[in-house]
Structure formats: structure tokens, C-alpha cells
Amino acid sequence: MKKGITNGKANGLFGSNDSCTRAQIVTFLWRAAGSPAPKGTAKVPADVLPGSYCYDAVAWALENGIINGLADGTFGVNNTCTRGQSVTFLYRAMGTAPTTVNGFTDVAADSFCADAVAWAVENGVTNGTSATTFSPNNGCTRAQIVTFLYRA
């Protein structure tokens, strides 16, 4: 919060155990990158309203290949960000190709997040939820996301 990457919620609380939405993580990444102005080249999905807190962040992330929209054409502003999505966004924003292969039984080699998971574990961003599982479809809390950002 000191660096302005995240904000608290109402009543002076951070909401550590609250689910982190896709809009929130992208906004955190955008702020960590210095809040660069988008170039105006991205087709921003209709569920990201102009003037909303995340509009510029989503536009920037789309322009830089950090995120994609969902299959239904939306961004999923209020959807909970999963572990697989969160490490993928971080990897695309900050990562370099991993030198190892992820060894988790629940992350297939052809999964959208396979390289990102390997990168995140290799670089100490996060671990699996057990020795053999990563749980890529589990939601992330705000505390987990800011921890991932700090470690990345």
C-alpha cells in the first residue's frame, strides 16, 4: 500500500482474505509498472467501463499481451482471479522463460499456465498447494496476490 500498488477497502481494512478479482490484479500490475498510459490500440471488452478504476489497466495489459479476454468476449471484471491466471499475468508482465518443467499433476504440459507455473515456482513467487498439486483453478485472495507481486 505504501507504494500505491494496492488500496485498502472500506473501514481502513485491506481485505486480506477477500477474493482478488481479475480487475484488481491487473490494476495492481499496472500500478507496479508505473501506471503507464495505454496507447489506445486495444479493443477493451464491454464489461470494462470507460472511467472505471481498472479501464486504463485493462487496456494497457491487453496492449502488452499480459491478459486476454474470456471466451464469451468479456474480461470478467468481477470474476475471482485463479492461481493459474495470477501466475500467468505475472509471468507475462515480468517473467523470463523457465528452465524447468512444472511437476504438478494438475497442470498439463499444454495448459495455458504451464510455463507460468514453472516460472513462479522456479523464482520463488509461489509453491504448489501440495507437493504434487498447484490447484490452478482455485481462487486467489488479495493477500496471496500481493505476496506474489512482492516476490516477483
Model-inferred region functions:
Residues 2-3, 7-26, 30-56, 63-84, ...:
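Feature responds to low-complexity, polar/acidic, surface-exposed segments characteristic
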Residues 116-123:
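Short glycine/proline-rich, acidic loop/turn segments that cap or connect secondary-structure elements
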